[in-house]
């Protein structure tokens, strides 16, 4: 018999008295699912299954039926299955008993129509004119007998309908029936919520995440667990302020250092002690007998040598000291530090490298004097000869020993000696403090002038350095304004005024200085990702530290939990997108790294890595590829890749191959070419630039996609940052105070921000979702997709479209502010070129630094090969990381923006070294110009510089030689300023002789912007030039002799110094009878006892005797031969040779004039040590000066100087009235001009001709507090 058709969901026992309806227990739904393989119809997104169950009539019928129930129903044992599995009373069959029961039930229902009309629900008329009734109340879910009273069953049904359990996140886990809760994973029915939770746990799902689809449940659980401890979702408020501040500055340069000692770098040293007979011992040593300290050494011979800071009292050692031994010792090491290989003689140096070594020595001299003279206070002197002058108080326990040296006029004795005679001739009142009150406004004055021992060169260097720092000094008012500007007003900065102004805070820097330093940084990066990537990582950490945005991936999972999917779907869009966004094998710091990349789009190009693109181009029919496209489309606008729009377009074009065709104008770059390959402007398809070329009929989706890109791609904007008027700006291709952004910027809400769906990135996401909905709706592209899958995909896209993420609004409002706040403090300032959006002609194709000679500055800009597809360093980012951040951003509860940023920014600006990077830029600029100045002295670079040292021999340095020299300069600068990281390293590679720096920025249309930063001037370079000019006159003080030497026998009893020989012993090229030995000269030995003949430079054969001139190079190349052939003629005095040296180090050997002395051993040893690549210090034999009569013995000299080279001699027999025998020198009054000449102005100096050894020294009482010590910040 045919089954009776049913309309109700329950079963009937066939008995008339079992007609009361019961709530549906869900088993019918299971049968429907089993019968309908295609799955149930898709409901509207967001509609829960529980709401669907509430709308069914079965439940309402139960409520109506239970209102009038007065007695329990009878037990129905006939509904129990028999041994064969047949159930009685379930179906109407051929058995007459079942038919009778059906007829009886029909009559009973007709009889009680008026009474129980609201209690019974009829079905359509079935077979044999029998109506199907609802399930009997005495039959349970499985058809067995139900012994529970009706009241109990009514309470259970009511509690199942009106649930008292708290609301759950996402979809309700079951459809409730009168008997329990059904699991949507396996359709099992549980009878209590606790049982259901335990059962769901057995599926591996968390109780509060049970969903309609088991696939979604599993992916959400995995998604949340994978993100649980990821660093990107951790709140970074626990990051220590100190660690954060370390990201903002590298080494703090040692810019300001103090010296409380004597300001002098030249030391008077005794060379030969005084030798006096016993009968005049008391007369000569009068001062020492009465313990009277002398201002000068009491010796037979005293000389001036270089010894920087020999009487200093410093707070920091720059470790650049130049210490020259007395000339009686060998100082050759000072002239062989550079460009001398290890194979050279230990006692020799290369004469062709003398100039480079002298320049390096002078640089060290300057660097070791970059101190400020510390004001140490005064005390009135009570000795009679100073007339109560205020003398400076020195720190330290040995201060007393310095007073006689500092103030020579404090000494006064009736003794007759050169020292006492000098002191007696001095101006007595030029001692101690000069013309300045010590107190100013109740405190120590800023500066004071002091008469004391000092050398004019050191005073000048320190004065210029002080002036340089004074130009950098900023007052509290400027600090207040600058910090407020840099902090974008989020930190209130005030500067209380004090009655004193003796603060030195050198933080002001010019734009030119910062630009030069910026170019050096860009050269340092080059194409090296290992240099720029840590910079971006540090900035990303800093952004995470100060940003209120929190990445909470549960926002995504909660949103996906509301997606309704059928449990029979083989594909789950929600599960697929969750799987795509898991952090496995990905660097999910890419989001904030992408933001950091906005600051450096001129030197680094952030691109989406190839793994984020659909594999092998992808297909529009693949669900996985569609989600790859969605993720990629959302992430691309946040990169700095100027080709990102066309990559977004070509990604979909790759997927549409075979479905839609677009006209491509390049045979290589076709529609099937991977989208990531379209990375240069010349690869952009013409149809993308002119979307009218895309047919809306043949390619409607791609036409729509191109229109979306052209209309909704984010628009670039800008924001103000920094304080260029005070702290300068390193911007090169943008205005000084402008920070460029690739997206639109809107003013931030200073109070509590609210969710905003009107920003650019949200609109962009919405358009991408709408495009994908058009794709899935079209059966042409998804022919195999079921309606259930399409509906699920549309629901997922709708949820993603309206996901409540704060990230888009954060990027438009707060992210620009954060970048603008940290940008002024970064060790690497922003380097940007304009963002171009979709303007292909303005796409940057080249940004590069050129180094060239100044006379070829018009050479074209760098021409990069076509294989260089990005500007600067390409940095690949994971699109999934960016998309997760875009979809899962949230703010802390009760966020007040201005309060948050005040608390977050204040610790950074409260760091004591926050702007030390500005000082580093100043040092970099100084170092660059110093290097350029020094290299110009040893090579031809067209750099306009005075060449004071051209008389010192030097090669014309090659690129490699100049690079070695530059490396030493770099090391010296880093040592002096206590820097450990890179300074001039980018200039060491290549050719340092190319002294002109320039930077070019070229666009695709061929337009080139060329920036040549102006050199603002270098104090260190100027000081080196000053020292070189002084060296040009005072070379003997530095251990160098000028001119040539003459080798020949000279025997005499006259006690003269070979450094100042008699004029009749000197000859030159213009002297009659002098022959020149040139490169083409030849020696012809005589036959049969005849004397050898030499062809001189004129070609004449002349005897080898008399006066000859040899170039040093020729002697070096033939040293062994000349030594063997010429020594006999030199020793006999028949031959005298002048070797053209130019400049040479020398060494003095003093001898007792009362005894015979012969210098041949010194001369022959020196000749033997000459090699083709080195010469030793030239030895001179000098008699000891005597203050009494002696019997002089003969002395044989073999080497004499051609010029006067005895300027380093300070005094002879200083403790005696006069010198009787030997070289005579009184204390040089010309070096004490202001002390001995009352008509000389107090501040007069005689540089560069003479180094004064007594001057007016300006000493300073400045405080050098950090910026944070003079301002008060209120967070």
Swiss-Prot record:
It is found in: Virion. Its cofactor is Mg(2+); Mn(2+). One of its GO terms (cellular component) is viral inner capsid. InterPro entries: Lamba1_VP3, Lambda-1/VP3_sf, Znf_C2H2_type. The keyword Transferase does not apply. Gene3D superfamilies: Inner capsid protein lambda-1 (3.90.1830.10). Residues 118-149 have a biased composition (Polar residues). Inner capsid protein that self-assembles to form an icosahedral capsid with a T=2 symmetry, which consists of 120 copies of VP2, with channels at each of its five-fold vertices. This capsid constitutes the innermost concentric layer of the viral mature particle. This is Inner capsid protein lambda-1. It comes from Reovirus type 3 (strain Dearing). The lineage of its organism: Viruses, Riboviria, Orthornavirae, Duplornaviricota, Resentoviricetes. The gene is L3.
